[in-house]
Structure formats: C-alpha cells, structure tokens
C-alpha cells in the first residue's frame, strides 16, 4: 500500500527546539545548529540493538569524510554506536537505525527514552538494507515506531518538503537500489522526527579500507551513488538546521554556489 502524504511542512526554527533541550538538561552540544559558513563539529551515530548487527559498518565513516569535503561541517571520522538507554543519545541530533533483518523491540524504558529523544528535537534516520520493500526489517521498524510514537504513522514525504533542498536540490531518494520510489517520515511539532528509506542508502555509501566501493549501485551506477551521497548530506543538514533553506537568503546562497562551485548540482 502506498503511504499517505505528510501535510506540507510549516516553518519552525531549530533554536526553540534546542532551547527546550538545553533547558531540560538533555542536549549537551550547543552550537550544532548553525547557518552555512560556520563550522560545527559533529559525530555520526548509529542506534545499536542487541539482535540487529550493522549491515554497513563503513558507511557512516565515509559519510563523515564526505561531509567535510562538501560542507562547512567538521566531522569526527569515527562514528559511535549507542544503545537506546545511553545518555549519550541526547548529544546527537541525528541517529541512524539500519538493518537487514527483523529485530526485537527494546524494553519499555528504552522505548520511553527514544520517545523523549524524538519529542525533544532528535531525528532518527531509518535505512533498510534488506534489498526489497516490505520485508522483516520494515515490519519491525513499523512496530517499533508504533510503540515509540503511538498514533503517528509513517507517511510519504511530499516533493515540496524542505528536506529536498536543505543543501542540494534533489528530487528522489536513491540508495544502493530503488526498492521504494518514495521517502517516508513521521512528523512531530511540524518537523521530521523520523526519516525512513527502504533503498539501502548506506549500501551506496559503504567503502572498504582499500578505497573500493563495497556494493554495486543499481540501476543507475555511479550517478545514483552520487545522488545517494547528496541525499545523505541533505539529511544531516536538515537534522542540524531544520528548514533554514526556506529563507530566501539561503536560496540565494544555493544559486550563487551553483554558479561558482564546480560539481555543485
């Protein structure tokens, strides 16, 4: 069944969200949400569940490298794996949940902590590496989200959403393959708290220690891989800055950069 569409997003600033987190003593890294031109040191994180091994362990390290190459962000090269109960969870605006199989639900206490993380400004990027839509991982993800965010059902992210222009201007959600032609999300307080792709995004990013891509990208080859990297960059920038690209000043920045920076889309 094709998911319903999210309502068109309305403008919300990142600062009120971070202020609420800081006031609650939850967010330990002020200054992450900054406009283009400033540097922010970030560390990418993956949510670690006991029965869900990382199917693409080199992907986040490669993404960290690409973030430094493509943006003004300064990224810690080594990602971190975090259990749902870890207090470090609240130091990371964006956390990845990836898998290629079904998994068990976390404990009630861990579910409550994830709910708090997503409610107070955190973003969960979910990436299926199953190679098809609607598999065991997908079923487990939907069950998890139903417990973490009861009443909020994943819905299709509309083409007009600011996520598609948070850094690069994009029109699709590529990965190692194209299992699902749409992106899903869950909104909280008019922002995407969950971003869900079934196209094995991390499979397109993974690169071994010898500099070789670990997986072929089909059907679009290296152009599709490049689009996957651009989408991953957009997700990171969205999680850090939310919808600042709706401001005309940033639209102007994109257009100037496209004219002056080789290889920019």
Segments the model singles out, each with a brief description of its role:
Residues 57-64, 111, 115, 138, ...:
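Extracytoplasmic/secreted envelope proteins and their assembly/folding machinery
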Residues 131-229, 233, 258-262:
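An acidic, glycine-rich "communication" segment
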Residues 79-84, 107-113, 179-181:
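Alpha-helical scaffolding within the catalytic cores
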Residues 91-99, 166-173:
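Charged, often glycine-rich, active-site loop that binds/positions anionic groups
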Residues 3-25:
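N-terminal secretory signal peptides and thylakoid transit peptides that target proteins
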Residues 29-94, 101, 201-202, 209, ...:
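Aromatic-Pro/Gly-enriched surface loop or interdomain linker
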Residues 47-50, 97-100, 127-130, 158-159, ...:
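Active-site-proximal beta-strand/loop segments in catalytic clefts of secreted hydrolases
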Residues 94-138:
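Short alpha-beta junction capping motif
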């Amino acid at each position: 069944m094709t998911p319903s569409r999210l309502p068109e997003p309305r403008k919300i600033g990142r600062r009120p969200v971070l202020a609420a987190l800081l006031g609650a003593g939850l967010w330990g890294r002020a200054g992450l949400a900054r406009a283009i031109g400033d540097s922010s040191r970030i560390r990418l994180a993956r949510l670690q569940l006991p029965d869900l091994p990382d199917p693409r362990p080199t992907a986040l390290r490669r993404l960290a490298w690409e973030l430094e190459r493509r943006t003004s962000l300064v990224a810690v090269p080594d990602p971190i794996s975090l259990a749902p109960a870890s207090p470090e969870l609240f130091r990371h605006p964006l956390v990845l949940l990836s898998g290629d199989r079904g998994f068990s639900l976390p404990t009630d206490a861990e579910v409550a902590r994830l709910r708090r993380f997503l409610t107070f400004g955190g973003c969960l990027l979910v990436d299926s590496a199953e190679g098809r839509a609607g598999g065991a991982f997908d079923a487990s993800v939907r069950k998890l989200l139903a417990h973490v965010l009861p009443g909020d059902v994943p819905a299709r992210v509309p083409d007009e959403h600011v996520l598609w222009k948070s850094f690069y201007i994009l029109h699709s959600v590529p990965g190692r393959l194209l299992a699902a032609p749409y992106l899903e999300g869950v909104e909280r307080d008019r922002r995407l708290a969950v971003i869900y792709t079934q196209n094995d995004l991390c499979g397109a990013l993974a690169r071994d220690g010898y500099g070789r891509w670990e997986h072929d990208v089909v059907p679009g080859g290296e152009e599709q891989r490049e689009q996957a990297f651009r989408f991953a960059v957009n997700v990171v920038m969205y999680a850090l800055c939310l919808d600042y690209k709706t401001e005309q000043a940033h639209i102007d920045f994109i257009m100037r950069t496209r004219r002056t920076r080789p290889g920019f889309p």
